[in-house]
């Protein structure tokens, strides 16, 4: 029977009164239960406390910035109200800053700007008009930064260029929205070229970028070790996508009939393999992104694939990837293991062979014109 809530004489048993302990055999402990240290609380009191608590919590709401009181509103105004806000251009600079906040945060802390260096080096051959080159350089920078925002979310990264990742500051949802917004801002910027081929290039390479990223994530999340050939295809889509985007846009705006895409494809592969190598060996890389971040991400990089496939019966490295460890000692052990399988030495040899191959392609494209200095400097930076 439920006590009358209006009665002031009905008391409830104190909540810390413990019943006799009964064993699994039904034996009841002979010791009397401890007396309550709390006095019985009348039901009207604890009901009143609950109401008070609800009232107090409702009056401590945090005020919203930019809010102000409005007078009574007539719902009939929606019969004639102009709801076409886009045509009235109500979008403000302040709202724009909200959207691009995560993008501008990362953009304000640039990396080594490898892509701008590449654009300028290839332009020695392609001789793109400066106005078009400015648009292309801006678009490539926007896409690169936006893609890094998404990468950091998908990889659960903590650091980017030695600073907290954008989604640790702005939140995951706002960061993803900002990156997606910038993808379309870049497309809008590209329309200034008034070149249909530029739009085709943009669409094709953005598709390739997401295809490569999708496979990279699939292997990580399903703990599936790809072959080297599958890895190279992924890199050609993911890393090579933005490289090709820049050069193919330049070719679309150039009057020089030269096809640089095969060379750019090789550069993209070298760049990614070299990045994988540095991730597991470079102290500078560790300071900017964390020690051996690929191991923490559970990523199947070039060295890790080689090491696992060198001895498939040993599951230690695969299990370390599965743990996505943040333990530095475990990561150092993994590096030692990969050294034992010859993966670092193998990667150095592959990079050396690919760099030599790229140099030969560069000299063939240059054909003695003396305009390949910038490309050779890029290749110098990719040697490990």
From Swiss-Prot:
UniProt-listed Enzyme Commission number(s): 2.5.1.-, 2.5.1.1, 2.5.1.29, 2.5.1.10
Site (Important for determining product chain length): 183
Sites where the protein binds Mg(2+) 1: 151, 155
Ranges of compositional bias, category Polar residues: 47-62
Residues at which isopentenyl diphosphate binds: 112, 115, 144, 161
Example GO molecular function: geranylgeranyl diphosphate synthase activity
Obligatory cofactor(s): Mg(2+)
A Pfam family annotated for this UniProt entry: polyprenyl_synt
PROSITE patterns: POLYPRENYL_SYNTHASE_1, POLYPRENYL_SYNTHASE_2
Pathway annotation: Secondary metabolite biosynthesis
Gene Ontology terms describing biological process: alcohol biosynthetic process; isoprenoid biosynthetic process; mycotoxin biosynthetic process
Record text on cofactor binding: Binds 3 Mg(2+) ions per subunit.
Binding sites annotated in the UniProt record for Mg(2+) 2: 151, 155
Catalyzed chemical reaction(s): isopentenyl diphosphate + dimethylallyl diphosphate = (2E)-geranyl diphosphate + diphosphate; isopentenyl diphosphate + (2E)-geranyl diphosphate = (2E,6E)-farnesyl diphosphate + diphosphate; isopentenyl diphosphate + (2E,6E)-farnesyl diphosphate = (2E,6E,10E)-geranylgeranyl diphosphate + diphosphate
Gene3D superfamilies, A to Z: Farnesyl Diphosphate Synthase (1.10.600.10)
Keyword line: Magnesium, Metal-binding, Transferase
Domain of life (superkingdom): Eukaryota
Disordered: region residues: 1-25, 39-78
Binding site for dimethylallyl diphosphate: 160, 238-239, 272, 279, 289, 299
Function: Catalyzes the trans-addition of the 3 molecules of isopentenyl diphosphate (IPP) onto dimethylallyl diphosphate (DMAPP) to form geranylgeranyl pyrophosphate (GGPP). GGPP is a precursor for the biosynthesis of many secondary metabolites, including the indole diterpenes nodulisporic acids (NA).
Family affiliation: Belongs to the FPP/GGPP synthase family.
PANTHER family according to UniProt: GERANYLGERANYL PYROPHOSPHATE SYNTHASE
Identification of the protein by name: Geranylgeranyl pyrophosphate synthase
Organism: Hypoxylon pulicicidum
